[in-house]
Regions:
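Short, low-complexity disordered leader/linker segments with a strong preference
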Residues: 1-36, 67
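Short clusters of hydrophobic/aromatic residues that line enzyme substrate/ligand-binding pockets
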Residues: 30, 47, 71, 137-140
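Extracytoplasmic "Venus flytrap"
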Residues: 30-31, 35-59, 81-87, 110-111
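Residues that mark the start of a beta-strand
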Residues: 34-36, 77, 126
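Flexible, small-residue-rich helix->loop connector segments that border functional cores
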Residues: 59-71
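Extracytoplasmic ligand/sensor domains, especially the bilobed periplasmic-binding protein
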Residues: 102-145
């Protein structure tokens, strides 16, 4: 099951990496040799045991992808930010990932209120949110702009 999920993740990354990019313009977080992913999760708060393992799992899978040659010769890099399961910290973390780190996509971010709080910012930057760790309908229903 895990391999299936990561295969889907890899497929989405490959699709998003090249859709809408021309020779003169590249997507945020995509360079000739790297694709930057971001996640905000609970690393030191009340559900840190879950957050820490999600970061470690993502890092392990990304290492496997990079060891196999990356995606079209590009290595993946993931930046994980700790929101301590607090909405204001999640907003700060997402703003850093979007504006300073210039991530290509958000992946496996933990928490319904945290994901809901940053959806608008991500939409403004055209940064997809793949596999949010939440079961809320707002994570699966289409976003109406």
């Amino acid at each position: 099951m895990t391999k299936y999920i990561y295969s889907i993740l890899l497929s989405f990354i490959m699709i998003f990496a090249f859709v809408g990019c021309s020779d003169q313009q590249s997507a945020q977080g995509v360079s000739d040799n790297e694709i930057v992913l971001g996640m905000h999760t609970d690393i030191s708060g009340p559900v840190s045991s879950f957050g820490k393992y999600s970061v470690e799992g993502a890092q392990m899978r990304i290492k496997e992808i990079n060891d196999a040659g990356g995606i079209h010769g590009r290595n993946l890099k993931i930046i994980a930010e700790d929101h301590q399961y607090q909405v204001p910290r999640a907003v700060q973390a997402a703003n850093k990932l979007l504006n300073k780190d210039k991530i290509f996509l958000m992946v496996a971010s933990l928490g319904t209120p945290m994901n809901n709080a940053v959806f608008e910012s991500q939409a403004e930057k055209d940064v997809p949110n793949l596999f949010p760790l939440s079961a809320a309908r707002s994570m699966t229903d289409p976003l109406h702009r």
